């Protein structure tokens, strides 16, 4: 499933062509994705201007004129492709030539400038919703989400307080979207390695008895932020389905230290151990038992 860096990469790729553009027409090539598309979907989008493109956790938010927001979730295998058109009179870096549509191109937006924005989703776990602007943060998909890990509200003090009473594993705590929004399996594994913390460690041990941050909490916040920023800069990680909107692969997977490296040597200088894989709450966890305590 695309995590925060992949969704943020898509958001940044959409801005040059979709933000400020008018949707001339929309095609819904099937009535549903994970859930049914909104009633009168094509009619409700035709003629609307996209005022801004934001992100909350793993959700893309397209503000429409008229006081509504289109929520788009990529699900397990969704991707967005831009074809044709030009930005400011010349081809944009996120454009590529228009090609034949595929069987999994389920929604197509035709923009007034000639470009098309296509949502492709082979497994159909994605979703597109249209919600009134003043109800967006109370919508069930977004209500209750924790702070953004790259935002000012996420720091060592917050993380320590949030974990202080948790007796689950540290990895399970970080995957809880109510604690911090947008983190997934890949980047939690990588951040824990950088912070030198075992995924088996109990979450409350990064805080003092009073809920104050320890050095562990401080290291972990820095590691999470660094991993996410580097992944965004690299265009995300392409393991199965993720593509940037110009069709290119992300390449952060080439810098993985632990994820999907079971049995391979740890890359830490002087460490002679190998990367191990365990299963936690039904998900594979990769870590170095020597470097992570």
UniProtKB/Swiss-Prot annotation:
InterPro entries for the chain: DNA_glyclase/AP_lyase_DNA-bd, DNA_glyclase_Znf_dom_DNA_BS, Formamido-pyr_DNA_Glyclase, FPG_cat, MutM-like_N-ter, Ribosomal_uS13-like_H2TH, Znf_DNA_glyclase/AP_lyase, Znf_FPG/IleRS
Positions of DNA binding: 104, 123, 166
Cofactor: Zn(2+)
Any Gene Ontology biological process: base-excision repair
PROSITE patterns membership: FPG_CAT, ZF_FPG_1, ZF_FPG_2
Entry note: cofactor: Binds 1 zinc ion per subunit.
Pfam families: Fapy_DNA_glyco, H2TH, zf-FPG_IleRS
GO molecular function, one term: damaged DNA binding
SUPFAM superfamilies named among the record's database cross-references: Glucocorticoid receptor-like (DNA-binding domain) (SSF57716), N-terminal domain of MutM-like DNA repair proteins (SSF81624), S13-like H2TH domain (SSF46946)
EC number(s) on file: 3.2.2.23, 4.2.99.18
Active site: 2 (schiff-base intermediate with dna), 3 (proton donor), 58 (proton donor), 283 (proton donor)
NCBIfam families: fpg (TIGR00577), PRK01103.1 (NF002211)
Family, as annotated: Belongs to the FPG family.
Function recorded in the entry: Involved in base excision repair of DNA damaged by oxidation or by mutagenic agents. Acts as a DNA glycosylase that recognizes and removes damaged bases. Has a preference for oxidized purines, such as 7,8-dihydro-8-oxoguanine (8-oxoG). Has AP (apurinic/apyrimidinic) lyase activity and introduces nicks in the DNA strand. Cleaves the DNA backbone by beta-delta elimination to generate a single-strand break at the site of the removed base with both 3'- and 5'-phosphates.
Quaternary data: Monomer.
UniProt name for this protein: Formamidopyrimidine-DNA glycosylase
């Amino acid at each position: 499933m695309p995590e925060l860096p992949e969704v943020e990469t898509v958001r940044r790729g959409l801005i040059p062509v979709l933000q400020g553009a008018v949707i001339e027409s929309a095609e819904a090539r099937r009535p549903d994705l994970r859930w049914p598309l909104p009633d009168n979907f094509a009619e409700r989008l035709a003629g609307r201007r996209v005022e801004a493109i934001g992100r909350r956790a793993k959700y893309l938010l397209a503000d429409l004129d008229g006081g509504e927001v289109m929520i788009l979730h990529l699900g397990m295998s969704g991707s967005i492709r831009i074809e044709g058109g030009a930005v400011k009179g010349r081809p944009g870096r996120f454009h590529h030539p228009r090609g034949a549509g595929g069987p999994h191109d389920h929604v197509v937006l035709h923009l007034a400038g000639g470009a098309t924005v296509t949502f492709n989703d082979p497994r159909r776990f994605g979703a597109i919703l249209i919600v009134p602007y003043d109800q967006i943060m109370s919508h069930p998909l977004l209500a209750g989400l924790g702070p953004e890990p790259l935002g000012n509200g996420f720091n060592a003090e917050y993380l320590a307080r949030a974990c202080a009473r948790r007796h689950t594993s540290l990895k399970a705590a970080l995957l809880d979207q109510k604690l911090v929004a947008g983190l997934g399996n890949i980047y939690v594994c990588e951040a824990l390695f950088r912070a030198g913390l075992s995924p088996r460690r109990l979450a409350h041990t990064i805080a003092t008895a009073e809920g104050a941050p320890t050095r562990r909490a401080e290291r972990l916040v820095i590691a999470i932020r660094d991993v996410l920023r580097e992944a965004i800069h690299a265009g995300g990680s392409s393991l199965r389905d993720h593509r940037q909107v110009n069709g290119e692969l992300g390449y952060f997977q080439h810098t993985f230290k632990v994820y999907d490296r079971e049995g391979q040597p740890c890359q830490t200088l002087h460490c002679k151990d190998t990367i191990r894989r365990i299963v936690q709450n039904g998900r594979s966890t990769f870590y170095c038992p020597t470097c992570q305590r």
